[in-house]
Swiss-Prot record:
Pfam short name (any one): ACCA
Source organism of this protein record: Neisseria gonorrhoeae (strain ATCC 700825 / FA 1090)
Keywords: ATP-binding, Cytoplasm, Fatty acid biosynthesis, Fatty acid metabolism, Lipid biosynthesis, Lipid metabolism, Nucleotide-binding, Transferase
Top-rank EC class of the record's enzyme: transferase
Quaternary structure and interacting proteins, as annotated: Acetyl-CoA carboxylase is a heterohexamer composed of biotin carboxyl carrier protein (AccB), biotin carboxylase (AccC) and two subunits each of ACCase subunit alpha (AccA) and ACCase subunit beta (AccD).
Classification via NCBIfam families: accA, AccA_sub, PRK05724.1
Name the UniProt record assigns to this protein: Acetyl-coenzyme A carboxylase carboxyl transferase subunit alpha
């Protein structure tokens, strides 16, 4: 797959194109230009490190939405075995913006749930661009209650612009579905591990992101509203999105400092989409450690700790 570069990555794109051209020349002729290719490759890596070491919140927001980032089904394929997808909320329909089912993680049975976006136009429409309707959240809850019934840990992957705001979704109880999930997740009697892998958009993300551990990939975001949406409300123009992103505190590092996130999972140089394999290794290592910790804690203590964690949201001290 040909890499897609964001606006601020154009200097990297130019170097990458030069490297590709030189590789083509080397393949088609007897001229040895491998040293020049290596020099440009090192220059490209150094430039990428330089650019990504000083990303603004607005730029991180762009990376979190990168069209080539791994989605939930990519993580399921890489981290789990024997995945059996389950469909429908048993009330209205099957929402393809939420995927989930039974699987094995390191041989242990678990339930996995997550948002799913599409790669091409047809799939994006089918997945509703990763924006669940009420039936998606009710499907997620059905799967999590199944996990509770059989004593299976729950692992969720969050990547959504937000819950779908359509009229039909509102008529079918979008806010009720989200609120019900929040309530049930606070008292679910099994370990719950949540990982933000891309966009963590408002209540649409929170409905599957209440757990014993909340992780974020290094270049993912988590906020009550998108920077563009916030700018449109406050300044009446999306051109102020960069200012909004800064004010919202949407980045993983910022949220970890506020004790809203447990672990920031390091991404490969250039973002998760640059190296799926390394991204999966990094995520797996964190989930393995957290699952072991959660299962070593007595259930009553686990639930008490989860409740205390939620009650601590929003606390602050004046200095």
């Amino acid at each position: 797959m040909k890499p897609v570069f964001l606006d601020f990555e154009q200097p990297i794109a130019e170097l990458t194109n030069k490297i590709d051209e030189l590789r083509f020349v080397q393949d088609e002729s007897a001229v040895d230009i491998s040293d020049e290719i290596h020099r440009l490759q090192k220059k490209s890596n150094d430039l990428t490190k330089s650019i990504f070491s000083k990303l603004t919140p607005a730029q991180i927001s762009q990376v979190s939405r990168h069209p080539q980032r791994p989605y939930t089904l990519d993580y399921i394929d890489a981290l789990f075995t024997d995945f059996e997808e389950l469909h429908g909320d048993r009330h209205f329909a099957d929402d393809h913006a939420i995927v989930g089912g039974l699987a094995r993680f390191n041989g242990q049975s678990v339930v996995v749930v997550g948002h799913q976006k599409g790669r091409d136009t047809k799939e994006k429409i089918r997945r509703n661009f990763g924006m669940p309707r009420p039936e998606g959240y009710r499907k997620a809850l059905r799967l999590m209650k199944t996990a509770e019934k059989f004593g299976l840990p729950v692992m969720t992957f969050i990547d959504t612009p937000g819950a779908y705001p359509g009229i039909g979704a509102e008529e079918r109880g979008q806010s009720e579905a989200i609120g019900k999930n929040l309530y049930e997740l606070t008292r679910l009697r099994v370990p719950v591990l949540c990982t933000v892998i891309g966009e963590g958009g408002s209540g649409g993300a929170l409905a599957v992101a209440v757990g014993d551990y909340v992780n974020m990939l290094q270049y993912s975001t988590y906020s009550v509203i998108s920077p563009e949406g916030c700018a449109s409300i406050l300044w009446k123009t999306a051109e102020k999105a960069a200012d909004a992103a800064q004010a919202l505190g949407i980045t993983a590092d910022r949220l970890q400092k506020l004790d809203l996130v447990d672990t920031v999972i390091k991404e490969p140089l250039g973002g998760a989409h640059r190296d799926f394999g390394q991204t999966m290794k990094n995520v797996k290592a964190v989930l393995e450690k957290q699952l072991h910790e959660a299962q070593s804690i007595p259930l009553a203590d686990l639930l008490s700790r989860r409740f205390d964690r939620i009650m601590a949201y929003g606390k602050f001290s004046e200095q």
